[in-house]
Structures are given as C-alpha cells and as structure tokens.
Amino acid sequence: MKIKIINRSHHPLPAYATSASAGMDLRASIEEPITLLPLERRLIPTGLFIELPVGYEAQIRPRSGLALRHGITLVNSPGTIDADYRGEIGIIMINLSNTPFTIADGERICQLVIARHEQAEWVLTDELADTERGAGGFGHTGKE
C-alpha cells in the first residue's frame, strides 16, 4: 500500500524495523529538548502529515521500551488518525514515573500502525441474543 506523506522534520521517514513488523517508529520533531515532569503530559510534534485511503486508520501506540524503562506512554492509546485528517501528527505523551524524562529531537517516541476498519450501521432493537456470558463483565470470566 502506498500512502502520501509530507515530512517537515529533518528525520528519515518512518520505516518498519523488520519484514514482520506491524508498526513504524515515529520521531519527535522539536527545536529543543522537552522535559516531562512526573505526571506531566505534552503534545509532541512529529513534522509528519499523511493522506490515508478511505477505509484505513493510523493507530498511534506506545513504545514498550519507553514504557518499561522510563514509565513514558501515551495518554490516549491507541490514538486514531482518521483518513480525512490532514494536520500534523502530534503525540500526547505522559510521564507516569517519579523522575523527569527528557525527549530529544529525533527520539523514537511511539509506533504507527496502519489498519483497515469498517463503519458500522446501527440496527435499533429491543433485545439482544442470549450468550453463555450474558451481561457479565469487568473480570466476570475468571481470575486465573
């Protein structure tokens, strides 16, 4: 699949790390380092603009290494970029650790996954089909 992209950063285009990778790393495109204090969140620019085909979305997901080693993740995860959005891709990051974390220009800050999606059409009804689970949720299927 070919996707149009504008790159206003001075970093390489996002790329798959391996032939089986689902996500491509996105990089911060900032003029000076940004320090996230504990529990602080900031919108981090990437310098990237994309044009997705209708029927596709781009999902923005955390990088597992940043989350594990530094407690850095995304506030809305996954974030969704719709096919009709044409603005800059911005990443809402948060520091869930107890120590400040500094983001440098060019640092890999998240992953982007391209995914097909459907649009649902609601069918209004007064009842739903019975299932074994029923209305049980929030841990109802077991604790082990």
From Swiss-Prot:
Reactions it catalyzes: dUTP + H2O = dUMP + diphosphate + H(+)
Keyword Cell membrane tagged: no
InterPro entries per UniProt: dUTPase, dUTPase-like, dUTPase-like_sf, dUTPase_trimeric
Pathway assignment: Pyrimidine metabolism; dUMP biosynthesis; dUMP from dCTP (dUTP route): step 2/2
SUPFAM superfamilies named among the record's database cross-references: dUTPase-like
Binding site for substrate: 63-65, 76, 80-82
Required cofactor(s): Mg(2+)
Top-level taxon of origin: Bacteria
GO BP: any one term: dUTP catabolic process
Pfam families reported for this sequence: dUTPase (PF00692)
EC assignment: 3.6.1.23
Entry keyword set: Hydrolase, Magnesium, Metal-binding, Nucleotide metabolism
Membrane-spanning intervals of the chain: none
Family that this chain belongs to: Belongs to the dUTPase family.
Name of this protein: Deoxyuridine 5'-triphosphate nucleotidohydrolase
Lineage: Bacteria, Pseudomonadati, Bacteroidota, Bacteroidia, Bacteroidales
Gene expressing this chain: dut
